[in-house]
């Protein structure tokens, strides 16, 4: 069974059971500031698991993009992935343990779906502890479906209790479903808790019964929910009879392309194989981050730093294989080939993704050349095999050399690093930067005079015009408006041409000439985003937001103020377009009466 087929069968099955298919959310969480990316299928639905009503109903099915970077140094083995997809079906109070288990059993065993013999199924349930009782209810449902007691395992909290994602939130017992692969037992003690590979965990059904508070106490949820998760990549590895996900159609087109470019053959050399897997994983993750609606770009902070790190790690391993410059962009088509039927954004933003990868690769090759040369000079001066924190920080601060790459180079040359020393220098650097940063441009309106208000409305027109001329990737990165001029920062990898500047100017002035009405409405944030309203990346909004729509042209989440009609603005003129920072451009513009 192929990747696309599994995804479709899952959605079709649960839709046939009355579930509503909902679109997966962005990789960037909008309701959890504790993590940089959505790392689990349930994360975007936490508010609804806690009691909010979902606009699509109480029985849902989705496919959620996820990204985990905690194990990034492990990526390159046969199993760890940065980007992955989670299939999920959800009950927000509509049904609970019995129906959830029965749905899972039917999908797994029905000849119309996965067609796995029930004689190969093993399950685990929560054994209970001093806080939460033993889950005999779920065990009884499994037994009623023909799973004998000797294939039902009661396991501890470590194995069969899920969540919360942070320290607090929804959580509960789960039941994990395993398939006997037919391999020989590794020992007489071999069972589903063994990591030898005989038993494959195919699905997990979480029963959100409780909410954990900040004191570690558990309170029963008024509305009990079901959250199930099936990892697509893991499942197709089993269904296709492969030993590794990298042997499946989730990666084969990418690996085929790497083989063609590098001249290396996957499966012939352990070191080369690891490099190929790292490149394949990281290019896929990079494509999905760059294609995301929030338009994350490589940088030295937050999500941008993660993106920069995985791009640069892929470049290093491509270099090890002897691959030439700008090779990552050549792999984008292979990622698109795998996912284009389901993720249209990979096709729509393909040119932008390639351009950003080339820009980052060009920057990094310069960094690598200078950084590696300096690294070798510095370690030659050391009297021990330990690299002090001030040296690793100097490589980071002066040469833009990521700590992780210094760490990898140190390992290659037989050195260790004083990580605590690096972190101490890094923290001091942050404190100094923060004090200085209090004085720099943060964006926003200097006042609410009529002239400033007009320029604020012009900024909305400019934002949309830039997207239409340069591409949908354009997002506001900063804004500063006075009564005399507007200053607008936006992400874009290249200097604008004179023709592009003129196109933007003309487009804004056309909207002014058309005398479009500017209307304000108040609505739920999710409704605003569904309506197509632009929102600022990283901005934390209330549940109810103000939305300004410029008739048929622009719609943004914004607090205002704005004029009533674009005809009030006068003539829009761009005075200057220049670089603001890496990957960010700045426009200065005025209005002429």
UniProtKB/Swiss-Prot annotation:
Cofactor note: Binds 1 zinc ion per subunit.
Locations listed in the record: Cytoplasm
GO biological process: alanyl-tRNA aminoacylation
EC assignment: 6.1.1.7
Residues that hold Zn(2+) according to the record: 456, 460, 558, 562
SUPFAM superfamilies (alphabetical): Class II aaRS and biotin synthetases (SSF55681), Putative anticodon-binding domain of alanyl-tRNA synthetase (AlaRS) (SSF101353), ThrRS/AlaRS common domain (SSF55186)
Obligatory cofactor(s): Zn(2+)
HAMAP family: Ala_tRNA_synth_B
Record's function text: Catalyzes the attachment of alanine to tRNA(Ala) in a two-step reaction: alanine is first activated by ATP to form Ala-AMP and then transferred to the acceptor end of tRNA(Ala). Also edits incorrectly charged Ser-tRNA(Ala) and Gly-tRNA(Ala) via its editing domain.
Record's protein name: Alanine--tRNA ligase
Lineage of origin: Bacteria, Pseudomonadati, Spirochaetota, Spirochaetia, Spirochaetales
Gene: alaS
């Amino acid at each position: 069974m192929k990747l696309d087929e599994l995804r479709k069968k899952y959605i079709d099955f649960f839709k046939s059971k009355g579930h509503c298919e909902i679109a997966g959310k962005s990789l960037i969480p909008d309701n959890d500031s504790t993590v940089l990316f959505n790392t689990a299928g349930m994360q975007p639905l936490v508010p609804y698991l806690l009691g909010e009503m979902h606009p699509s109903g109480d029985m849902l099915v989705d496919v959620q993009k996820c990204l985990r970077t905690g194990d990034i140094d492990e990526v390159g083995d046969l199993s760890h992935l940065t980007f992955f997809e989670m299939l999920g079906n959800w009950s927000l109070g509509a049904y609970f343990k019995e129906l959830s288990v029965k749905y899972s059993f039917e999908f797994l065993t029905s000849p119309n779906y996965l067609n796995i013999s029930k004689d190969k199924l093993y399950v685990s349930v929560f054994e209970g502890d001093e806080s939460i009782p033993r889950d005999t209810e779920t065990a009884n449902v499994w037994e009623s479906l023909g799973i004998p007691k000797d294939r039902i395992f009661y396991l501890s909290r470590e194995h069969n209790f899920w969540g919360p994602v942070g320290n607090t939130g929804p959580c509960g017992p789960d039941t994990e479903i395993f398939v006997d692969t037919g391999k020989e037992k590794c020992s007489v003690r071999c069972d589903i808790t063994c990591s030898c590979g005989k038993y494959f965990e195919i699905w997990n059904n979480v029963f959100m019964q409780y909410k954990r508070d900040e004191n570690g106490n558990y309170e029963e949820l008024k509305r009990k929910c079901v959250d199930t998760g099936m990892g697509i990549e893991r499942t197709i590895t089993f269904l296709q009879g492969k030993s590794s996900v990298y042997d499946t159609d989730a990666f084969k087109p990418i690996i085929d392309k790497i083989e063609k470019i590098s001249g290396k053959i996957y499966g012939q050399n352990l070191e080369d194989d690891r490099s190929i897997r790292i490149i394949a994983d990281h290019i896929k993750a990079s494509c999905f981050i760059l294609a995301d609606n929030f338009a994350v770009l490589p940088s030295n902070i937050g999500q941008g730093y993660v993106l920069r790190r995985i791009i640069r790690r892929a470049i290093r391993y491509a270099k090890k294989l002897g691959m030439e410059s700008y090779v990552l962009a050549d792999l984008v088509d292979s990622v698109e080939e795998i996912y284009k039927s389901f993720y249209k954004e990979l096709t729509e933003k393909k040119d932008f993704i390639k351009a950003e990868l080339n820009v980052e690769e060009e920057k990094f090759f310069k960094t690598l050349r200078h950084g590696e040369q300096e690294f070798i000079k510095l370690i030659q001066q050391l009297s021990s095999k330990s690299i002090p924190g001030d040296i690793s920080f100097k490589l980071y601060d002066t040469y833009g050399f990521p700590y992780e790459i210094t760490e990898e180079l140190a390992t290659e040359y037989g050195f260790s690093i004083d990580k605590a020393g690096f972190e101490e220098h890094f923290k001091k650097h942050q404190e100094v930067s923060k004090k200085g940063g209090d004085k720099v441009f943060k964006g926003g309106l200097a006042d609410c005079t009529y002239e400033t208000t007009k320029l604020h409305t012009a900024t909305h027109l400019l934002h949309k015009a830039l997207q239409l001329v340069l591409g949908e990737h354009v997002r506001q990165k900063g804004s500063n408006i006075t009564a005399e001029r507007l200053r607008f920062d936006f992400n874009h990898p290249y200097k604008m041409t004179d023709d592009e500047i003129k196109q933007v100017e003309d487009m804004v002035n056309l909207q002014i000439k058309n005398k479009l009405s500017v209307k304000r409405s108040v609505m739920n944030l999710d409704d605003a985003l569904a309506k197509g309203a632009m929102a600022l990346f990283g901005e934390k909004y209330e549940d109810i937001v103000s939305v300004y729509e410029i008739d048929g042209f622009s719609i943004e989440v914004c607090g205002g103020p704005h004029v009533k009609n674009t005809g009030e603005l006068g003539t829009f003129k761009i005075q200057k377009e220049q670089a603001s920072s890496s990957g960010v451009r700045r426009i200065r513009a005025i209005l002429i009466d």
